[in-house]
Amino acid sequence: MQPIQIAIAALVVAIIIAIVVWSIVIIEYRKILRQRKIDRLIDRLIERAEDSGNESEGEISALVEMGVEMGHHAPWDIDDL
């Protein structure tokens, strides 16, 4: 192979690796943003529950829409056997 062909092949491989790495970074960043949003909603729920004595239905429904289950999550409760 000519040196120019090797350089082009290396450039193509580097571009493919960069695309894969940045795709993974974007996916992880979205997960972090989603988790922050969930954490903020849970904090608001806790704050409102302390203030009023009950929980806000609107925020619970927002958490349910995102797929977050509310309730007691004990690590020793294993129901997936």
Swiss-Prot record:
One of its GO terms (biological process) is receptor catabolic process. InterPro entries: Vpu, Vpu_cyt_dom_sf. The modification Phosphoserine is found at residues 52, 56. GO terms for cellular component: host cell membrane; membrane. It is a single-pass type I membrane protein. Keywords: AIDS, Apoptosis, Host membrane, Host-virus interaction, Inhibition of host innate immune response by virus, Inhibition of host tetherin by virus, Ion channel, Ion transport, Membrane, Phosphoprotein, Transmembrane, Transmembrane helix, Transport, Viral immunoevasion. The keyword Transport applies. The chain crosses the membrane at residues 7-27. Residues 28-81 are cytoplasmic. Changing residue 52 to N: Complete loss of interaction with human BTRC, and of CD4 degradation activity. Residues 1-6 are extracellular. Phosphorylated by host CK2. This phosphorylation is necessary for interaction with human BTRC and degradation of CD4. Pfam families: Vpu. Ion channel activity is inhibited by hexamethylene amiloride in vitro. GO terms for molecular function: CD4 receptor binding; monoatomic cation channel activity. It is found in: Host membrane. Enhances virion budding by targeting host CD4 and Tetherin/BST2 to proteasome degradation. Degradation of CD4 prevents any unwanted premature interactions between viral Env and its host receptor CD4 in the endoplasmic reticulum. Degradation of antiretroviral protein Tetherin/BST2 is important for virion budding, as BST2 tethers new viral particles to the host cell membrane. Mechanistically, Vpu bridges either CD4 or BST2 to BTRC, a substrate recognition subunit of the Skp1/Cullin/F-box protein E3 ubiquitin ligase, induces their ubiquitination and subsequent proteasomal degradation. The N-terminus and transmembrane domains are required for self-oligomerization and proper virion budding, whereas the cytoplasmic domain is required for CD4 degradation. The cytoplasmic domain is composed of 2 amphipathic alpha helix that form a U-shape. The infectious clone pNL4-3 is a chimeric provirus that consists of DNA from HIV isolates NY5 (5' half) and BRU (3' half). Homopentamer. Interacts with host CD4 and BRTC; these interactions induce proteasomal degradation of CD4. Interacts with host BST2; this interaction leads to the degradation of host BST2. Interacts with host FBXW11. Interacts with host AP1M1; this interaction plays a role in the mistrafficking and subsequent degradation of host BST2. Interacts with host RANBP2; this interaction allows Vpu to down-regulate host BLM sumoylation. Belongs to the HIV-1 VPU protein family. This is Protein Vpu. It comes from Human immunodeficiency virus type 1 group M subtype B (isolate BRU/LAI).
